[in-house]
């Protein structure tokens, strides 16, 4: 392997970072039909995003250089989230030249992770593209695990199942305020239970409940409620999604999808999906975007059957906090 130079990224590197992302995007277009050539507006948007990283000192990144040529990089933002100091490497924060080994990403991480840990950031989140297996291979080889999948459903492709007649699906209205608030705990309760085990911090639960309390009054949101024998069984929540360099225009977000556990297995999710699919098409959307926890057994098996194709995953590694003192710099480990 070439002896690359690894050094901290600087503002002067931004144009080479953008070139690597554009190259990565070209490769991904081979796998995802909804991905198109980047237009100038998207390139400008991407340029502004990369430039802004260097105006914020919480972003820390390292690049691999072949002399002066940047051939790969990882750049993450150190922040406090959910009571922990974490590093978040966004979709723009990682890229590798197409003819370079995935091993280089592992070496870049070796260098950049030391800088993150120096700042006390022990949870590392990296959003990787799935159109190129090198990213997944590299992070799995660094003890990262898959936490969240992000997917697109192309509405030009037909659904492969039918709605069940016993399920009635309707659009929520302002009279459903208390009902929606009462159903707000469904999805988080799934996340909190086995085998997902996401902590339900009281302040987070309170924030979610307050958010749902008035969501029926939001004209930008569409809520579908499923009922069986006039009893609420589940709901889907849709809203518009702003296009980005990697999200196509005319895309809506399926933000929340939930079914009462005791009513699962009766076709509720499928019926909601069919009605949402048809309704979003009448609103001139061409794609639906959603995401799910990999460890959520119901979500991770159901959404792919609805036509959702993952294009990005959030990979996570959590470093044992004892490393901050249990190391060979500690006085008790000195000879």
Where are the regions that the model predicts?
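Flexible, substrate/cofactor-facing loop regions flanked by secondary structure
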Residues: 165-249
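Conserved acetyl-CoA-binding loop-helix of GNAT-fold acetyltransferases
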Residues: 100-114, 256-259, 265-278, 282, ...
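Active-site/acyl-donor-binding loops of N-acyltransferases
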Residues: 141-160, 274, 278, 283-335
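Conserved donor-binding loop and adjoining core beta-sheet/short helix segment
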Residues: 29-107, 228, 233-257
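Acyl-donor-binding surface of acyltransferase catalytic domains
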Residues: 1, 95-165, 312-320
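Conserved N-terminal entry element of GNAT/NAT acetyltransferase domains
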Residues: 1-15, 155-175, 324-335
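Conserved GNAT-fold acetyl-CoA-binding loop/helix
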Residues: 26-48, 191-211
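A short beta-loop-alpha structural element at the N-terminal edge
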Residues: 4-31, 168-191
């Amino acid at each position: 392997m070439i002896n690359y130079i690894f050094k901290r990224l600087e503002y002067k590197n931004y144009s080479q970072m953008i070139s690597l992302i554009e190259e990565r995007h070209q490769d991904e277009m081979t796998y995802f039909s909804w991905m198109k050539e980047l237009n100038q507006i998207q390139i400008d948007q991407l340029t502004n995003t990369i430039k802004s990283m260097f105006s914020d000192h919480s972003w820390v990144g390292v690049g691999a250089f072949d002399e002066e040529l940047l051939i790969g990089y990882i750049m993450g933002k150190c922040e406090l989230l959910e009571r922990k100091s974490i590093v978040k490497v966004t979709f723009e924060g990682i890229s590798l030249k197409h003819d370079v080994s995935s091993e280089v990403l592992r070496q870049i991480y070796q260098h950049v992770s030391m800088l993150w840990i120096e700042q006390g950031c022990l949870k590392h989140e990296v959003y990787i593209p799935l159109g190129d297996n090198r990213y997944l291979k590299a992070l799995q080889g660094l003890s990262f695990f898959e936490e969240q999948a992000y997917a697109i459903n192309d509405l030009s492709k037909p659904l492969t199942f039918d709605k069940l007649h016993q399920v009635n699906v309707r659009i929520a209205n302002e009279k459903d305020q208390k009902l929606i608030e009462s159903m707000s705990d469904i999805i988080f309760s799934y996340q909190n239970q086995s085998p997902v085990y996401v902590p339900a911090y009281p302040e987070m639960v309170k924030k979610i409940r307050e958010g749902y309390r008035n969501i029926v009054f939001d004209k930008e949101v569409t809520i579908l409620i499923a009922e069986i024998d006039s009893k609420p069984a589940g709901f889907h929540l849709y809203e518009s999604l702003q296009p980005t360099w990697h999200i196509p225009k005319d895309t809506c977000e399926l933000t929340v999808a939930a079914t009462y556990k005791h009513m699962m297995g009766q076709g509720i999710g499928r019926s909601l999906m069919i009605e949402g699919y048809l309704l979003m098409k009448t609103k001139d959307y061409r794609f639906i975007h959603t995401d799910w926890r990999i460890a959520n057994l119901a979500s991770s098996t159901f959404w792919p059957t609805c036509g959702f194709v993952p294009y990005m995953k959030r990979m996570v590694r959590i470093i044992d906090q004892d490393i901050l003192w249990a190391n060979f710099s500690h006085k008790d480990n000195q000879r």
